[in-house]
């Protein structure tokens, strides 16, 4: 079951329910829970900040059975995702592994989900935008 790690956390931690091998590349990792998100709410799956900066914690997969797996950090990232209102199925967390395959131990917190209220504006096609003259984007105002 997802939990807040501290009382004022914005979201709930998502746990891997059992030992899971993470292969190189993108992979959907089942979390073992189903959700029913009500109308007007969405869930935003986010990486945990510690994994984002330090790498994802897991165990090496030894080439030989007599070698013991070693705990280390791997270059793997959680890809952000949205759980739409009305969704009624199991949550998966997408991991992009840029490293060697590794095993995440069952019970490891790998991501978090934050729920938000949302509104959908009515979109209209137009040839002219009125209001602020604000263009550019992507850093057009500089850094200082």
Regions found by a protein language model. Give the residues of each.
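DUTPase catalytic domain/fold
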Residues: 1-144
